[in-house]
């Protein structure tokens, strides 16, 4: 049952699958597996879309080109409906976020023992293949969005406009500046935190459920049969979850950046 080929207790099995391959200690710990899969999937996304773009023709498109065009059109329409400013970066950014996050989420569809077992054959003791079950990855994505929010808020409104937004809303009175600053700062900081924790929480919970279902295998015939049924049912439902979470992350990014472009 263990990915390393050793007999593990149920608690040890769960802990093994939730442990990252890491180097360093404390704050300076690097999760090598999360970095490898997130960067690798990002490169794969760029390669696929670049290849399709170079081979695109005005004639009858192939299946892959149709699929890519459908995604691009869907994201482009989402941006048109939700983003009210003018910025040529937003649509490519939204496309990158949606596809990249979906691809990282989709790694959760691979049976939980396959990749860790393959890694153990190469002498790698731990392997987490779903980058979005690592809070460091989700916070990295969210912080990137947060920095863009700050950048465009200052670029569009100016430093003085940005400061006024933090100090004179929602109560437009000088006496309320401390209260406004506190409320607006909390609201601003809550954006990346909610983005990161929502994605992490949903994918971590989904991964944990797959692991718990996998524990049923090898116990007895009844539980093994039940495990197969549960695995299939959760797999079908989880496809909706991973797609929805990628969509939500993309849409909130678009909305937050649209708010940053509003010049009052």
From Swiss-Prot:
| Record function comment | Key component of the proton channel; it plays a direct role in the translocation of protons across the membrane.
User: Where is the protein found, in the record's own terms?
Assistant: Cell inner membrane
Give the quaternary structure: F-type ATPases have 2 components, CF(1) - the catalytic core - and CF(0) - the membrane proton channel. CF(1) has five subunits: alpha(3), beta(3), gamma(1), delta(1), epsilon(1). CF(0) has three main subunits: a(1), b(2) and c(9-12). The alpha and beta chains form an alternating ring which encloses part of the gamma chain. CF(1) is attached to CF(0) by a central stalk formed by the gamma and epsilon chains, while a peripheral stalk is formed by the delta and b chains.
User: What is the membrane topology here?
Assistant: Multi-pass membrane protein
Q: Which UniProt keywords apply?
A: ATP synthesis, Cell inner membrane, Cell membrane, CF(0), Hydrogen ion transport, Ion transport, Membrane, Transmembrane, Transmembrane helix, Transport
| UniProt key word Cell inner membrane | yes
**InterPro entries in UniProt:** ATP_syn_F0_a_bact/chloroplast, ATP_synth_F0_asu, ATP_synth_F0_asu_AS, F0_ATP_A_sf
Family assignment from sequence similarity: Belongs to the ATPase A chain family.
DNA repair among the record's keywords?
no
- Residue ranges of the TM segments: 29-49, 90-110, 134-154, 177-197, 208-228, 235-255
Molecular function via GO? proton-transporting ATP synthase activity, rotational mechanism
Listed GO biological process terms: proton motive force-driven plasma membrane ATP synthesis
Annotated Gene Ontology cellular components are: plasma membrane; proton-transporting ATP synthase complex
- Descriptive protein name: ATP synthase subunit a
């Amino acid at each position: 049952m263990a990915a390393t080929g050793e007999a593990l207790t149920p608690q040890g099995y769960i802990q093994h699958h939730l442990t990252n391959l890491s180097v360093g200690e404390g704050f300076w710990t690097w999760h090598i597996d999360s970095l490898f899969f997130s960067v690798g999937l990002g490169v794969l996304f760029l390669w696929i879309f670049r290849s399709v773009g170079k081979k695109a023709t005005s004639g009858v498109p192939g299946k892959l080109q149709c699929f890519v065009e459908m995604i691009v059109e869907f994201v482009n329409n989402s941006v048109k409906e939700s983003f009210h400013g003018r910025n040529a970066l937003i649509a490519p950014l939204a496309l990158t976020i949606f596809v990249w996050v979906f691809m990282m989420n989709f790694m959760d569809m691979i049976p939980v023992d396959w990749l860790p077992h393959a890694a153990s054959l190469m002498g790698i003791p731990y392997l987490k293949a779903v980058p979005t079950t690592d809070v460091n990855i989700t916070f990295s994505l969210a912080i990137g969005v947060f920095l863009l929010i700050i950048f465009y808020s200052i670029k569009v409104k100016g430093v003085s406009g940005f400061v006024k937004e933090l100090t004179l809303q929602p109560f437009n009175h000088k006496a309320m500046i401390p209260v406004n600053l506190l409320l607006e700062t909390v609201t601003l900081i809550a954006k990346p935190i909610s983005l990161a924790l929502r994605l992490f929480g949903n994918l971590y919970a989904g991964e944990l459920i797959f692991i718990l279902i996998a524990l049923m295998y090898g116990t007895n015939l009844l539980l093994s049969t039940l495990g197969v049924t549960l695995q299939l049912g959760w797999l079908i439902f989880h496809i909706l979850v991973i797609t929805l979470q990628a969509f939500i992350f993309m849409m909130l990014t678009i909305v937050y950046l649209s708010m940053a472009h509003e010049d009052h």
